[in-house]
Amino acid sequence: MRVGIDEAGRGALIGPMIVAGVVISDTKLKFLKGIGVKDSKQLTRERREKLFDIVANTVEAFTVVKVFPYEIDNYNLNDLTYDAVSKIILSLSSFNPEIVTVDKVGDEKPVIELINKLGYKSNVVHKADVLFVEASAASIIAKVIRDNYIDELKQVYGDFGSGYPADPRTIKWLKSFYEKNPNPPPIIRRSWKILRSTAPLYYISKEGRRLW
């Protein structure tokens, strides 16, 4: 048995970061590879959604941790990621996985130490979601769940594009919302530095660990 873990929305300005984990046997890994499971960023949304159902019904189990903007604004993002990884591994531990594969983000040492401390072999590498099917499967789970969550937010707050700071639609929406509303919406990450220029009164520094 192998565990694969990946995230979606780490760098987003809007919405949660979704961290997903799957546990799967080697035999089923071959099946998923054969049907085209790969890094979610290389797939269209339609293809991701089709593969989501197949992945969910093929893996032994999957689990998801949502990390919301207010958490990201008050704690170190890497620490939140490590905490999510720990929760996922513990929730899948009953399957006795041999190894845990995680996409490397930043310094891999804390993740390796965490996995080893929990009693498992670690495989923490850059582009794990491209190189290892178990991580690719987790990336599809994470991305589809985040996409659907973002769709729900748009029903309430309007179309803000992808929710990433590099998206002009997202910035246009933020500026428009800022002009009309003195209070920030709970869906944005107020500690993102782009707010300094686009919505300065919404911006908070992580240093103060201020809550909403």
Curated annotation (Swiss-Prot):
SUPFAM superfamilies per UniProt: Ribonuclease H-like
Sequence similarity: Belongs to the RNase HII family.
PROSITE patterns: RNASE_H_2 (PS51975)
Annotated compartments: Cytoplasm
Name recorded for this polypeptide: Ribonuclease HII
The enzyme's E.C. designation: 3.1.26.4
Annotated a divalent metal cation binding sites: D6, E7, D103
